[in-house]
Amino acid sequence: MKKILEDVMLICVGNSKVKGDSLGPMLGSFFENNNLYDAIVIGTTNNPLSYNKLEQMKNYIDSNKLKKKIIIDSALGNSMSIGKIYISEKSFIVGDGVNKGIKLDADFIIKGVVGTNHTCIEKNKKELQNVDEKILKSIMNKIIEILPILVWKKYIG
């Protein structure tokens, strides 16, 4: 499995101080601490890739043309989508749920829906604070399981 992700940059977006926004950093720490893959990991619980830090890192991420880029982030959606994972192959606007936005291009964007999206930004912030930890762990396990399969199918298989 190590070789599958050796040319990959995992961009694990989020703020480890906000439970619902910590999916990316939690996964980044998992991949880094367990040394499962030879991927470059950006964003961990000890060194989270929050919105403000992403502004500083964007040039580094964009300039690294040799790596396949996979963005992992939490998202808000409708109540029926909580716990689901959405995968796309396009650009991604980080911070969209709280009316901010930094565009990143990636080979894959993996979003785990952790709570309900509201029209009010303050409600969204509160929603992210009150996410059920069981939902986070369930989404994490799904992403850990599917990540090598995604890369394999796209680049090897």
Enumerate the predicted regions with their spans.
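N-terminal catalytic or cofactor-binding beta/alpha core of small enzyme domains
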Residues: M1-G157
